[in-house]
């Protein structure tokens, strides 16, 4: 099945992303510790992440032209996080460094035997965007605008600019935020975490929740990631599901797997693939990401992704 809309071609960037960045402190342990115990860590690593920043880095590695808009703190973590985006070649003209603020951080405990993780995070309130602070003119510069829906009123400003200019709007949402109902009618491609449709609609059955999500807000493509079961899309009255792939060499860390999935999915759309093929590409990029610690180290190049797809048939 093809997308039910055309992506524009006359844009400076293939994809632009407005949303979160973060610096992750990764802590690898043999198994997740029980209460009132001590566990020696196997590895500690500082790594850059954040839903939207990671998606833009992933698309850039795949050979597309991307730009990122978001706020970094003025602390050493912020300097580190910003340098990782810049060094990948992602355009940062709309990035802001907020004086006397701390960049978003996360402490992520990863179980070595499964690769599953638990995240404890913090975000400085000074990094939040008010609607009048949204980067006007940014969203319209990409064929696709990708959002993570933090600061929904500001996201709505950027999304409205994008829609008015013919840009397709994509959103990766994992939680319910104040002002979200005003943003969602502006989203063309809405793919959330496996819990998101239920949380928003109150409907337990996944497929029924996706149908209600589309009926309520009008997104032409809706879906959810399903972890090790792949992903599910609902479009034009049809459900399309693609199973997950195994991480090459085994799963080391699931941190950022959803961000990587979105990048692979959007990559497929941007290069003209069908929804079915794009789902497989999303699952492939997510699987490859999981082969190393951190959200970004194992994100593939175009050649690496093509080789992986050949290997899985």
Feature-to-residue mapping (PLM):
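Short gly/ser/thr-rich secondary-structure transition/capping motifs
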Residues: 1, 124-130, 169-175
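Conserved phosphate-binding/catalytic loop of the ribokinase/pfkB sugar-kinase fold
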Residues: 97-98, 108-144, 149
